[in-house]
Regions:
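Activation on extended, non-transmembrane soluble regions of large proteins
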Residues: 1-7, 13, 45-48
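Non-transmembrane, solvent-exposed beta-strand/loop segments in proteins
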Residues: 21-206
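Short, disulfide-bonded extracellular cysteine-rich repeat modules
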Residues: 7-23
Length: 206
């Protein structure tokens, strides 16, 4: 089973690489616009940020520029995953059109920017839970993984200008506190909880 859907032909008839769609969704029930809320509980989205650089600090314009790599993880119990690899299971762009992605924005950037827009992201499935054999009705043998036991992992890259209110009354001995603010779209705030994990500064110290 481990050799099924591994992008290599291990069977002489090549049947091990047929029907290898990684995501199974009941299209008549799955509604992409709605978060994966279950039994009245909110969807937890775990957030980490790598700050790759901070540049172009402009006190007069009250802005700074930052290059970011952002990590988001959540689970969607409405999805079944198939034949997951332990080494990475990246989703094609076409699949991203059919699954729910967190509607998150930078609220203090120049213009509210959607963090999870397709042009900025990659999405991977992390194999964490145990496998289950396909149902007997399935024509192709393989393993299934439950959406509530395996994380969806989204990585986003952005370089943007952010607003910051600089306090200059003690210049040049001042210390400024600026932020990068991430918000959930208003209509979904009652269904989603952002869970901060860590933030790393990977740029050059000056």
């Amino acid at each position: 089973m481990e050799d099924r859907c591994n992008f290599l032909y291990d069977c002489t008839d090549r049947s091990d690489e047929l029907s290898c769609e990684i995501v199974s969704i009941e299209n008549e029930k799955y509604q992409k616009i709605f978060p994966p809320v279950s039994n009245g509980t909110k969807t937890d989205i775990f957030v980490s940020i790598d700050v790759l650089s901070i540049t172009h600090i402009d006190e007069m314009a009250r802005t700074f520029t930052s290059r970011l790599k952002l990590y988001f993880q959540w689970r969607d119990q409405r999805i079944t995953f198939n034949n997951l690899s332990p080494h990475g299971n990246f989703l094609r762009d076409s699949l991203l059109d059919h699954i729910w992605l967190p509607p998150l924005y930078f609220s203090n950037s120049k213009g509210w920017i959607l963090i999870t827009g397709k042009e900025h992201i990659t999405v991977n499935i992390l194999r964490q839970g145990p496998p289950y054999l396909n149902q007997a009705s399935e024509l192709n043998e393989g393993k299934e993984y439950r959406g509530d036991e395996n994380d969806l992992s989204l990585i986003a890259y952005h370089q943007l200008d952010f607003d910051c209110i600089y306090e200059l009354s003690h210049y040049p001995f001042d210390i400024q506190k600026c932020s990068i603010d991430i918000k959930v779209a208003d209509q979904f705030r009652q269904y989603i909880t952002l869970m901060p994990k860590k933030i790393n500064f990977l740029g050059k110290s000056t």
